[in-house]
């Protein structure tokens, strides 16, 4: 695939940790937790970017990360290129190792909401308290624990509903789902669902979507009547083929967002894009913008187009979709002029005309924050 880059790409380094990946040391990348227990430099310096949230008011980017020593949250200032450690390590517990997916900014409250994930083995989690739902007060610079929905389980993804004051969590290792009322400060319900999404969102009527059973069918939870339904026939046609690609045991959904046009948009581990109608529960296949696996993040741009990032193993590309014509345009590869390339994208946010991409799982070095200028059009698309 030949692509002429329409974007200007740079990367930002928080901790420049590098590692010899000779055959003798290659296993350090494979056994991250075990290795960090023996290597202080690896424990404190090695990190990956996993979740992003853009603050329009302060023009700062909040960055959730994977970090063995608990430094999981930083603020990035694009005007200076500087990162600020927000001090999560002061409240971190033993198994708190990442903000995997779901870093939600409530602009009215000036607060961030997220859940805590782990890399610990199952034996290490037997006596563990479980992943916490967290709130960070930006102005007070304070972390508060909202609650622990499922003891012994850690939170791979969250969804946040500021209107109905709800948080939703998707868990490993049991592949469960939980609904938490922020208003009442309690767990509303929790279920083993035998599938897991990478990240999800809430539809216009307040329903949150996930996948369940070995077939990875969609479910919808509606907090207004505390109802959880599995609509008949609402399943991705490639659900089984797309499963297990994100990581072992993962479901097919790489990203699911509210498109702001009455529909939900779904990407899969195969890199496909679908439109989901919450009213009819029908799924329409739009296309596959790249010839590689993965599409971990999609966002709606200021011009009305749908923007995505996908690819893997150093072949990471930005693309956009005209939802009216269902056509795709590949904007360019996420790679800098010095030859450094984004190894594996994990999240993306749009800030004006710029796309920021979180990089994870990069072998031999820490992950970087990627800045792709000129990615997003300036004016709303006209019909």
Where in the sequence are the language-model features?
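Repeated scaffold domains used in trafficking and secretory/extracellular systems
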Residues: 46-53, 95-104, 152-160, 195-203, ...
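Residue-level signature of beta-propeller blades and closely related beta-rich strand-turn architectures
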Residues: 67, 117-119, 173, 214, ...
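Short, conserved, GDST-rich strand-edge loop motifs in beta-rich repeat architectures
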Residues: 114-129, 361-363, 367-368
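Conserved beta-propeller blade signature
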Residues: 60-63, 112-113, 166-169, 207-210, ...
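Beta-strand-rich domains and repeat architectures in extracellular enzymes and scaffolds
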Residues: 4, 34-68
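Blade-level signature of beta-propeller repeat domains, shared across WD40, Kelch, NHL, RCC1
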Residues: 342-383
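Short loop/turn segments that connect beta-strands within beta-propeller blades
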Residues: 77-81, 137-141, 181-185, 222-226, ...
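Surface-exposed loop and turn segments in beta-propeller and other repeat-based domains
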Residues: 13-42, 87-95, 147-153, 230-248, ...
């Amino acid at each position: 695939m030949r692509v002429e880059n329409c974007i200007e790409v740079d990367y930002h380094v928080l901790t420049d940790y590098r590692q010899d990946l000779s055959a003798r040391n290659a296993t350090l990348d494979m056994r991250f937790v075990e290795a960090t227990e023996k290597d202080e430099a690896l424990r404190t310096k090695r990190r990956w970017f996993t979740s992003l949230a853009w603050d329009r008011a302060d023009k700062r980017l909040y960055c959730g990360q994977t970090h063995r020593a608990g430094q999981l949250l930083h603020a990035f200032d694009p005007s200076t290129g500087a990162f600020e450690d927000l001090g999560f390590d002061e409240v971190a517990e033993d198994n708190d190792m990442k903000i995997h997916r779901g870093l939600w900014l409530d602009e009215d409250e000036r607060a961030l909401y997220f859940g805590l994930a782990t890399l610990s083995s199952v034996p290490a989690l037997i006596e563990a308290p479980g992943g916490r739902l967290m709130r960070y007060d930006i102005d007070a610079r304070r972390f508060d624990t909202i609650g622990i929905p499922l003891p012994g389980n850690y939170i791979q993804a969250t969804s946040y509903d500021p209107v109905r004051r709800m948080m939703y969590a998707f868990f490993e290792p049991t592949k469960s789902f939980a609904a938490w009322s922020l208003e009442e400060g309690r767990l509303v319900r929790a279920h083993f669902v035998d599938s897991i999404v990478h990240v999800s969102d809430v539809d216009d009527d307040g329903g949150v979507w996930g996948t369940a059973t070995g077939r990875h069918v969609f479910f919808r939870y509606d907090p207004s009547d505390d109802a959880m339904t599995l609509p008949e026939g609402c399943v991705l046609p490639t659900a089984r083929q797309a499963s297990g690609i994100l990581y072992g045991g993962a479901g097919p959904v790489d990203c699911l967002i509210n498109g702001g046009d009455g529909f939900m948009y779904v990407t899969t581990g195969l890199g496909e894009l679908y439109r989901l109608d919450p009213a009819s529960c029908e799924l329409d296949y739009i296309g596959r913008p790249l010839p590689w696996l993965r599409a971990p993040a999609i966002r709606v741009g200021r011009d009305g187009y749908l923007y995505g990032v996908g690819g893997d193993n150093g072949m990471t590309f930005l693309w956009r979709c005209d939802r009216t014509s269902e056509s795709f345009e590949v904007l360019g590869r996420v790679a800098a002029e010095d030859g450094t390339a984004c190894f594996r994208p994990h999240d993306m946010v749009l800030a004006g005309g710029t796309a920021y991409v979180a990089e994870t799982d990069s072998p031999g070095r820490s992950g970087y924050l990627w800045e792709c200028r000129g990615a997003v059009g300036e004016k709303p698309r006209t019909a």
